[in-house]
Structures are given as structure tokens and as C-alpha cells.
Amino acid sequence: MNLYLDDLRPTPEGFERVYSYSDFVAYLKCKGLPDFISFDHDLGEGLSGYDCAKYLVDYCLDRQLPLPDFAVHSQNPVGKENIERLLNNFKEQQKTILKAI
């Protein structure tokens, strides 16, 4: 399953959509990790896509799960870079841990 996090853009074919941080958290709690997540950064008022990415990292750490594949489709260049940096750093950390085991 593919997950699309965005409050405005149309949902691409083959994706389930969540609009907000609370939707994102509820999706993971109910359905678990998708195979792929496409992130927007700016989600209107409230928490952002970066907050969703932080939740995802904690979710994976707590459950000892690998990070799913992801992309960031946000038009906000700073927000996009922040999400990519967080998730790519976590992905590298997971690789290092697996090599040590």
C-alpha cells in the first residue's frame, strides 16, 4: 500500500490519502506501515509533514521496523529538505545498526 500525505493536491492513483498529522498517526495505528509514503510539508494549520516524519521515525524505532520507502513532493524547499534529511539520516542509522548485528 502507498500513502499520500497532503491537504490540497489530488490523490495519485494507487495511493491512500491522509490530510493531516492526526490522520497520519491514525493510519499507522490502524493499518501499520505502508510500503511507500509521499510527504507534503505544509498541511494547513497545525502540525506539518515534518512532524509526521518525526512520528514515523519514533514508530519505527519503537517497533524495530525498517523505514518504508518515501518521497517528499512538497513545494516548500526548506520543509522538503528537513524531511529528507531526517528520514535519510534515520535510514542510514538503521543500516549501520543492521550491519553491527
Placement of each model-derived feature along the sequence:
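Catalytic phosphate/metal-binding cores of nucleic-acid and nucleotide-processing enzymes, i.e., regions
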Residues: 1-101
